[in-house]
Amino acid sequence: MMYFRRKAAVLTAVGALAAMTATGCSGSIDTDAVVATVGEEDISLGVANFYARMTQGQYETYYAGMMGTTGEAMWTQDAGEDQTYEDSVKDGLMESLQNMYLISQHAADYDVSLTDDEEKAIAEAAEQFDADNTDTAKETVSGYKKDIEKYLELVTIQSKMDGKMREGVDEEVSDEEAAQKAMKYVYFSYTTTDDSGNSTELTDEEKDELKSDAQELADRVAAGEDISTVAEELGQTANDLTFDSESTSPNEDLIAAADALESEGDVTDLIETDGGIYVGQLTSLLDRDATDQKKESIVEERRQEQYDSLLEEWRNDTDIEVHERVWNKVDFEDTGVTIITSETDETATDGGGSSDTSEDSGAAE
């Protein structure tokens, strides 16, 4: 069976949306079909497809190359738990879309609504997208005015609700709860790397010599010498690290040994690992800057926990149903999307935003 890959350059001047190039053999879909229900509210396939294609374009444009693959091949990769990468991403997209609707349904509880200016901006954005793109392009991504407007309404409400849903958490954090210590450590590696990046493991004799160097450093630093100076003399580098008992990097045994030290200036024993040897010196029992940053992190964690808890509560109180047969019509493998910009796509910007279509042939059994 033969098919053609359609290319449609999609242009938008709105920052919330992305310019896209769509490729594939996707046919028209019923954008009014119900892909899911959240409480009493239906999610249309048009809104779901537009949101999915926007996200798909980001993955294919920015991540496929980093993963050393093509957009097509990326979606068929195994994501574990008997899922392809496409299955996994689509599951996340559907959950995120449901969350948008849940948040919108509770916006009135927080006195959140769209302003006249926001509604006007959304309408203008949808109209501009509609005017700038061909029917072929809009068909591929469901880029129609009603679907774009609904999508932008949802993301705008979600943005305005974000802070509201995080308000009211306890922002008091004690030094004891957030305490961060500081150390300097030296890592004596059992491998060397040449200028070409090739690694070579030391011989047993060389490892013994390295262990002697590590012990010399530990002894001299314990006697009062500066760890950075001694490390440099031995051809090594002393690294700075702030940590607490829950830290795991660069090595859990090093963290545990340093955390057990009672006084600033104390030195750990040699921490031997499969890859080398660590020696650490405690430099501060309470690093002020790191502790204050940890306090901010703890407060932000509390805000996030409250946000997640609210969403979970709303989910539990709401009937949610996904119509899989409809959702399956959104297929990433056969229909690709690539983010483009007007600066790099002359065809898209010619004539005030017209879009171009072309065809690349492909075959499938």
Identify the residue ranges that each predicted region occupies.
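Solvent-exposed coil/turn segments that connect beta secondary-structure elements
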Residues: E41, A48, R53, F188-T193, ...
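Bacterial N-terminal signal peptides that target proteins for export
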Residues: M2-T12
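N-terminal targeting/tethering segments
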Residues: G27-S142
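Peptidyl-prolyl cis-trans isomerase
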Residues: S212-L254, D289
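PPIase-associated folding chaperone regions across multiple families
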Residues: I29-T31, T134-E209, Q215-E216, E232, ...
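Second-shell loop/turn segments in exported
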Residues: A33-V38, A79-M94, I103-S113, G143-I148, ...
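C-terminal motif of bacterial Sec signal peptides marking the signal peptidase cleavage site
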Residues: T21-G24
